[in-house]
Amino acid sequence: MTKNFRFEKDSMGQIKVPSEALWGAQTQRSIINFSIGEELIPIELIYSLTVIKRAAAISNFKLGLINNVKKDLIIEACTEILDGKHDSQFPLKIWQTGSGTQTNMNINEVISNIAALKTNSGLGSHHPIHPNDDVNKSQSTNDTFPAAIQISVVTQIIKKLVPSIKELTKVLDSKSNKWKDLIKIGRTHFQDAVPISLGQEVSAWSKQLKDAEDALIISLNELCFLPLGGTAVGTGINCPKDFSKESIKSISEYTGLFFYKSKNHFSLMASHDRLAQVMGQIKILASALFKISNDIKILSSGPRSGIYELIIPKNEPGSSIMPGKVNPTQCEALSMVCTQVMGFEYAVSIANASGTLQMNEYKPLIGFNILTSIKLLNHAISNFRLKLVEGIQPNPKTIKANLENSLMLVTALVPKIGYEKAAEIANLAFNESINLKEATIKLGYLTANEFEDAINTNKMI
């Protein structure tokens, strides 16, 4: 037994810890007490907490609270974690304490034990770096964990999600420009409407995504104000003056992003309105993508019995029973991701509303849902672009046939003959299965030349 385990001690006594594990007693207790699901704390959140620990060590050294040796050992340990060398040492689930305390201690213990290995002091010795007294100095989970969520969300959106959106809109803009002169029938209420160019139709998708991106970036502004330094309840107990300012400066330098000290720590620890707001903008992005994917599904329906104005890439067989079938699978995958994100947003809203007094006790759930949404959308958008949008092509023959066969071209006659006569033409054409020109001449409202001059689709867009 002693071969596979070592004994570590915390304020509750001794506990067995796997002999090679870099975590300690409090992490092990969490593993035992919260055997729920498989959803781990996102590694991006672990890294952001590690950035905070690194910044805290620098600040504590500058303020004379730890010596140079301890500072360097903590920084070295943080560097190894941020390089991805110890990802397996963070095994905790999101289903734990609502403050994230066990994850904060998980990081504190791992940093302590990395330092112990470097100095041949033995795992679990808490020497020369103590997880609480050194790594966690001047901090509380209650200010570091929400700050880490904010840092990781801002970082992942700016460095991962926004570039994916930009790449997709770039491709859509290219398609829009290429198809600007390809006139097709527009549709409202799933019924024929007046003409529009395919380029104009695609431009709507691009603009919708650009607007969602802009709103998302704007929502990050308030998220850059961190509650670091508020410690337990926002008052800053046990946190020296200038610690927050110095730490946030180090965080900004390390991440290359601008973060600032919050003017009111209490609000950012008791509630997470700003995170909920960002999640709301992520949901709006998801709703835009959902709409675009549905449009493409409709326009590519067929190939013989649907609209079939767009031809999607043939990526894989679509059916196990129907040979030759090609399905809009990328649209379906993206739609499912968007559906999940919308559900996550609802959970974040409830979680944000459910905090009590000086603490919101749903932090791991909020962090997980937002970061998972960012990751899912990032991957789904890239896949959607590469496997569908870049290869999508128009079907000019079907587009032309649908346009010429539409009764709604009669709208162009309204300025010449009025609404009622135009409606009469459309009804006659439909009832007798003739075209608009034939119906117009039959009713004697216009000559053939007058009709041709009025029904010029190039003038309708």
Swiss-Prot record:
InterPro entries: Fum_hydII, Fumarase/histidase_N, Fumarase_C_C, Fumarate_lyase_CS, Fumarate_lyase_fam, Fumarate_lyase_N, L-Aspartase-like. It catalyses: (S)-malate = fumarate + H2O. Its EC number is 4.2.1.2. Pathway: Carbohydrate metabolism; tricarboxylic acid cycle; (S)-malate from fumarate: step 1/1. One of its GO terms (cellular component) is cytoplasm. GO terms for molecular function: fumarate hydratase activity. CDD domains: Fumarase_classII (cd01362). It comes from the Bacteria. The active site is at H189 (proton donor/acceptor), S319. It is an enzyme of class 4 (lyase). There are 2 substrate-binding sites: the catalytic A site, and the non-catalytic B site that may play a role in the transfer of substrate or product between the active site and the solvent. Alternatively, the B site may bind allosteric effectors. HAMAP family: FumaraseC. Belongs to the class-II fumarase/aspartase family. Fumarase subfamily. Homotetramer. PANTHER family: ASPARTATEAMMONIA/ARGININOSUCCINATE/ADENYLOSUCCINATE LYASE, FUMARATE HYDRATASE, MITOCHONDRIAL. This is Fumarate hydratase class II.
